[in-house]
Amino acid sequence: MRIGIFGGTFDPVHDGHVNPVARAAERFGLARVIWIPARVSPLKGAPPTDARHRVAMVALAIDGRPDWVLSFDELDREPPSYTVDTLSALSARFLRDELWLLMGTDALAGLRKWKDPEEVVRLARIAAFHREPFVGQGLAIPEVAGLQNRLEVFDGGSFKISATDLRTDLARGGSPAGRVPGPVAEYITKHRLYRGVEG
């Protein structure tokens, strides 16, 4: 069985996350996708929004998709959240399955900065998506041993949404509608998230 792994701060989870993951699941035949909110990203630092809100938003975003599940693996571990540690734990749990690590091409470009990138590539195939129309040129593939044979790049659709820009817009009174799943937009509005907090 192929299992997709998709991690991030999800602050907030938005259509630029959900739609490419749906495309990946269909294209690569992923029987399950595990969504893993990070406690603290080593490259980003602590997210501005409390984990309980980020978890609630991911739960709402994936509701209705029984093949998409929410994991607390990184939230339950002491920070920071290293992908290689998460993949190591998952590979021990799913011994007979093939792990596929899903990420944007922006994250792929920085793969060499990750902890033990060669082990990341050994533990999981990489499926990297563009969030805008892909013309097939200009993609910088990092020099990581084994990556060339373990990498699939695909068009994630025209969903170029930045969580940072979204938070900034919401802080200025903007609406989340049209950029996040409907239930997530309602949650953001109900709990007045991101109001007056830019970045």
Per-region residue spans from a language model:
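Nucleotidyltransferase catalytic core that binds NTPs
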Residues: 1-199
